[in-house]
Amino acid sequence: FSGVDSMFSLVNDLLLSNEKSFLSKGSLFSHGDLCFSNMILSESEDSIIFIDPRGGDSFRTPYYDLAKISHSLLGGYDHIINNKASICFNSDMTAFLDFDMNKDKSVKDLFNSFLESGDYKPEIVALVQVSLFLSMLPLHIEDTKKVYMLALRASELISGIKDHKNR
């Protein structure tokens, strides 16, 4: 990618080309910020407590909350924000993120099976997830390394979507 603007443009074009599928699920009640840092596991009650819901518009496409979960589960958002990721370089000096998660594809496969069982398209969840990474850039502008990692992760995910479409 030539820059963040080209990523925004591509994601926008891909979302618009999938608009019918994206909107097909209608609007449901939404937490609005369904990431791991807003979940508390209560072992004594054998439950998960969701905190810090977004106010305002409580109804959204379910793809949004699914993408927020994927953002944490598969995207590595929490690893980046909590400084648990590293920027590395291949022999050709191509940058990539290294973080200790998803080495085992079973989590991704299980999540994608869950999506497909509800007739949700994993590629649309991935597109929304990329838009989330891009939308986080100005929120972390005080930390150049995090901004670079968020943009790099968005780029990696877009490349994965493009590779999937080319199969």
What are the roles of these predicted feature ranges?
Residues 34, 54-55:
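A short beta-strand motif that forms part of the nucleic acid-binding face
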Residues 29, 49-52:
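Pre-DFG segment of protein kinase catalytic domains
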Residues 29-31, 36:
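Catalytic-loop of the protein kinase fold
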Residues 38-49:
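Conserved protein kinase catalytic/activation segment
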Residues 1-29, 42, 116-117:
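An alpha-helical support segment within catalytic cores of ATP-dependent transferases
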Residues 21, 25, 57-60, 121-124, ...:
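Short, solvent-exposed segments of well-ordered alpha helices
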Residues 48, 55-114, 130-144:
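Active-site activation/catalytic loop segments of kinase-like enzymes and analogous catalytic loops
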Residues 2-6, 46, 120-167:
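Regulatory N- and C-terminal appendages and interdomain linkers associated
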